[in-house]
Amino acid sequence: MRATLIGHAGIFIETRQGSILCDPWFNPAYFGSWFVFPRNDQLNAELAKAIRQPNYLYISHLHGDHLDEQWLVDNISPQTPVLLPDYPTKELERRLRHLGFTHFIATSDGIACDLGDDLSIAIHVETSITDGPAGDSALVVSDGVHRIVNQNDCRTSDLGALLAHGPIDLHFLQYSGAIWYPMVYDEPAQRMRELVDLKVESQFARAMRYVEALNARAIVPSAGPPCFLDPELFAFNDIAKDSFSIFPDQTKFIAQLNAVQRHGIINIPGTCITLGDDIKVLHPIAEADVQAIFSDKESYLRNYQSDYLLWLEDMKTTWSQESPDLLTTLKLWWEPLLAMAPALRRGVGAACLLRAGDLDILIDFPNGEVRPFNNEAYGFRFEIDRRLVETVV
């Protein structure tokens, strides 16, 4: 069995019985705010061809850095069998059917599914509110000899259930941040420093708990961090020592693994890991060049950014422009939702100011009303580029 990293949480798993393509993400996500790091737009031709012809497709969950809809439409046959997590809702299946996929292999949460000839998979799902739309999932793959756990960014609550399938050779695991907290909050610098440090520490602590519980032969840092090439967001990359960033790179996680004598594998898109009596790692470039990506990260990111600045400019021209009825549209959309959610309104307990460019909108949670802001008291404030609000609406 071998696993080739293709960027972020993307993994191409090859066994003698067939291949599984996991979470391929290539197009910048979230309105161009997230890019794959290290970049994966330069895979060699052989690998680029192979990942377009998998025997199975696995999409862990609905987030844009895992479900790259445009790439799937452009590159993967809709006849490819999809390994479907056992979510309580059908949202992921509906999205994939909308893209043209028709062959789904339904799984039961945590139960091994025999794909034939000693190839088996099990998908473990999590469905708490923090797991996002429809939930999140982790994949266990066994070829009868070796076993991989692709936990990606799934916060698995029952780690014993993952381990119950047998000893683990490779554990793919998120360790870095994947949200904008706390950087986008309005906090004094000292408080922001405290919040950022606490967030990074908690991320590492959670990842190390998973590492100790699963006790794999090797741990592969996965599912982040992304990088930020938009000039307005570039400062959120973990470059300067005093930056307010929750996105440490692999080298810092590897250092933590080394400190407790765990085998961590640094990787970039194209890194191939082959399982046998030994674990063999082959990078697509020289080891020194791999290390340079992280040791000279700012230079690497600036070069990467230069290739996408025009793309970013063009992408922003596609955002919806100002319309005269944004307030009315939001009022008609949100007030019925507020009426359906009295417990939520009580929980929020205050009004929220939405500042969309020069338009100020008050979302009055206690009274379930959306109206123009008239200098009333409010408990929360969001400042969002109006073009983004218009585009989402």
Name every feature range the model reports, one short phrase each.
Residues 25-29, 34-35, 124-144, 154, ...:
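Active-site-proximal loop/helix segment associated with metal-binding centers of metalloenzymes
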Residues 42-112, 388:
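Active-site HxH/HxHxD metal-binding segment of metal-dependent hydrolases
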Residues 266, 273-393:
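Feature captures hydrophobic
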